[in-house]
């Protein structure tokens, strides 16, 4: 028996979804990421292109910011800021048609991710001007992870006291032994 040498197979990257293909046609650079467990298309974007890409997606029907948040990939790794956009008006219009097929009922949604270095002060442009609902969501992400949102109208802590040191949801955060709260009255 002779064995033929097998050529190593390189795992194929994710297939571009409809939103990625649309962004390519519009000339927007982005990174294809694996879809999430529900099949939602996930796209990586550079922070300098975030506002332009979000504005283009909003013009294409993604009229609802369902969620904005952040997470820490681990000590020494990157911070991630994500935006989940939904084409809500299209979904409402489809509901009125009465077509209950799974393809007609499918909601157009996309998740954008911006990967940031934890060195210095991570920052990216605020999308508050495009989605007013980003107000408290961006403030919470700032409060918990220390990501600054340039152009945000209220750039201050939301949950933690103003004089709190550090960013509590970063994985390298060291909780202080003692913090004295002032009386509220």
Swiss-Prot record:
Classification via InterPro entries: NADH_DH_suC (IPR010218), NADH_quin_OxRdtase_su_C/D-like (IPR037232), NADH_UbQ_OxRdtase_30kDa_su (IPR001268), NADH_UbQ_OxRdtase_CS (IPR020396)
Keyword Translocase: yes
Single GO MF descriptor: NADH dehydrogenase (ubiquinone) activity
GO biological process terms on file: photosynthesis, light reaction
Keywords: Membrane, NAD, NADP, Plastoquinone, Quinone, Thylakoid, Translocase, Transport
Localisation: Cellular thylakoid membrane
Signal peptide as annotated in the record: none
The reaction(s) this protein catalyses: a plastoquinone + NADH + (n+1) H(+)(in) = a plastoquinol + NAD(+) + n H(+)(out); a plastoquinone + NADPH + (n+1) H(+)(in) = a plastoquinol + NADP(+) + n H(+)(out)
EC code(s) of this entry: 7.1.1.-
A cellular component annotation (GO) from this entry: plasma membrane-derived thylakoid membrane
Protein topology in the membrane: Peripheral membrane protein
Subunit structure as annotated in this protein's UniProt entry: NDH-1 can be composed of about 15 different subunits; different subcomplexes with different compositions have been identified which probably have different functions.
Similarity comment: family membership: Belongs to the complex I 30 kDa subunit family.
HAMAP family registered for this protein in UniProt: NDH1_NuoC
Protein task: NDH-1 shuttles electrons from an unknown electron donor, via FMN and iron-sulfur (Fe-S) centers, to quinones in the respiratory and/or the photosynthetic chain. The immediate electron acceptor for the enzyme in this species is believed to be plastoquinone. Couples the redox reaction to proton translocation, and thus conserves the redox energy in a proton gradient. Cyanobacterial NDH-1 also plays a role in inorganic carbon-concentration.
Protein name as annotated: NAD(P)H-quinone oxidoreductase subunit J
Organism: Prochlorococcus marinus (strain MIT 9303)
Gene from which this protein is expressed: ndhJ
